[in-house]
């Protein structure tokens, strides 16, 4: 059987089990009887493509929460979030305040990093190479080159291959997802429409990506070559996507997720995990809502458990949502960064 005939989950499970076997052998003091295992370099090499792509895999099935301070970070960790994303303002407030949205204050990021044990991510403006270099120097676990912040470069994204820290990027369709992947992103998330509390755009983007992957699978090689040109990506990445029948990297859902039901819906549509922004901390019940969303994401296959999660919150305490149709074209964040 060829490697590309295995599913993503099968490959992931194999490497997890291989690591477990090595740990068991080491714990029982048997390495001296297995010289080949002793030769394996146990040093962690940061910055390699393998390491950068592996980190997001460990976030699969979990929820990353947007936060602006230490208190919110601690609530997220207590609720079971797999990571936090530090911003200067939550997306809802970015939308309301207008002006230029930039990277969060490094001092706040450091305070968050020292107060919790889960990974800490932070956002940079699209194309802002030096904001990314600062976050890399700061030691964050992942960088989000985000359309929520005001783009620094309207035409180009950061060349992420130059960094030792992994990046996540947003996408509305397969072309955007593969372009970001070819630039060195280690994770993709649907863009949705951040700061609205309206999950409809995240649903649309996830369905578009899934549909375009299905179309890719059924194409001839000649048509895939044409599609690679259309997407402006190397043919090999298109071919790999078709063969493994999914994006080559982890794909999370984001944009407008506000309730446990929203979380379960996006997981049901095929998301590997979730980013939840304003939906938690712009609600009136952030502690319970954070726990409920994490529970729903983890147990989305069991409606009875998601129902219990939904009962943990009050709809009357949910953030005030924004109808996408009421937004002017220039108010849409998702169109930033193609």
UniProtKB/Swiss-Prot annotation:
CDD domains associated with the record: pdxS
InterPro entries assigned to the protein according to its UniProt record, in alphabetical order: Aldolase_TIM, PdxS/SNZ, PdxS/SNZ_N, RibuloseP-bd_barrel
Keywords: Lyase, Pyridoxal phosphate, Schiff base
Binding-site residues for D-glyceraldehyde 3-phosphate, renumbered to this chain: 207
GO molecular function, one term: amine-lyase activity
Alphabetical list of Pfam families matching this protein: SOR_SNZ
GO biological process annotation, one example: pyridoxal phosphate biosynthetic process
Pathway noted in the entry: Cofactor biosynthesis; pyridoxal 5'-phosphate biosynthesis
EC number: 4.3.3.6
Keyword Lipid metabolism (UniProt): no
Active-site residues, record numbering mapped to chain: 123 (schiff-base intermediate with d-ribose 5-phosphate)
Binding residue positions for D-ribose 5-phosphate: 66, 195, 256, 277-278
Reaction(s) catalysed (UniProt annotation): aldehydo-D-ribose 5-phosphate + D-glyceraldehyde 3-phosphate + L-glutamine = pyridoxal 5'-phosphate + L-glutamate + phosphate + 3 H2O + H(+)
Job of this protein: Catalyzes the formation of pyridoxal 5'-phosphate from ribose 5-phosphate (RBP), glyceraldehyde 3-phosphate (G3P) and ammonia. The ammonia is provided by the PdxT subunit. Can also use ribulose 5-phosphate and dihydroxyacetone phosphate as substrates, resulting from enzyme-catalyzed isomerization of RBP and G3P, respectively.
Family, similarity comment: Belongs to the PdxS/SNZ family.
Subunit structure and binding partners: In the presence of PdxT, forms a dodecamer of heterodimers.
NCBIfam families: PRK04180.1
Protein name: Pyridoxal 5'-phosphate synthase subunit PdxS
Gene of this entry: pdxS
């Amino acid at each position: 059987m060829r490697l590309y005939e295995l599913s993503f989950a099968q490959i992931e499970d194999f490497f997890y089990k291989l690591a477990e076997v090595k740990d068991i052998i080491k714990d029982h003091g048997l390495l001296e009887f297995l010289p080949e295992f002793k030769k394996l370099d146990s040093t962690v090499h940061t910055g390699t493509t393998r390491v950068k792509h592996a980190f997001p895999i460990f976030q699969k099935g979990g929820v990353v929460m947007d936060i602006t301070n230490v208190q919110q970070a601690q609530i997220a960790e207590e609720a079971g979030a797999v990571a936090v994303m530090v911003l200067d303002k939550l997306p809802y407030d970015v939308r309301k305040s207008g002006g230029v949205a930039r990277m969060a204050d490094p001092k706040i990021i450091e305070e968050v990093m020292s107060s919790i044990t889960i990974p800490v991510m932070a956002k940079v403006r699209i194309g802002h190479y030096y904001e990314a270099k600062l976050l890399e120097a700061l030691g964050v676990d992942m960088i989000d080159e985000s359309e929520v912040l005001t783009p620094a470069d309207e035409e180009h994204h950061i060349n992420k291959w130059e960094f030792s820290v992994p990046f996540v990027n947003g996408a509305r369709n397969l072309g955007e997802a593969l372009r970001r992947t070819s630039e060195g992103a280690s994770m993709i998330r649907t863009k949705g429409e951040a700061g609205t509390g309206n999950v409809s755009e995240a649903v649309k983007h996830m369905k578009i990506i899934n549909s375009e992957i299905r179309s890719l699978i059924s194409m001839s090689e000649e048509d895939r070559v044409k599609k690679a040109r259309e997407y402006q990506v190397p043919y090999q990445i298109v071919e790999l996507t078709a063969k493994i029948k999914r994006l080559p990297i982890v794909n999370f859902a984001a944009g407008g997720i506000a309730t446990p039901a929203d979380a379960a819906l996006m997981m049901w549509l095929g998301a590997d995990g979730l980013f939840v922004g304003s939906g938690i901390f712009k609600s009136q019940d952030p502690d319970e809502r954070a726990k409920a969303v994490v529970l729903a994401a983890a147990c989305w296959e069991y409606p009875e458990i998601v129902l219990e999660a939904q009962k943990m919150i009050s709809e009357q305490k949910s953030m005030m949502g924004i109808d996408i149709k009421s937004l002017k074209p220039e108010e849409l964040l998702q169109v930033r960064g193609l």
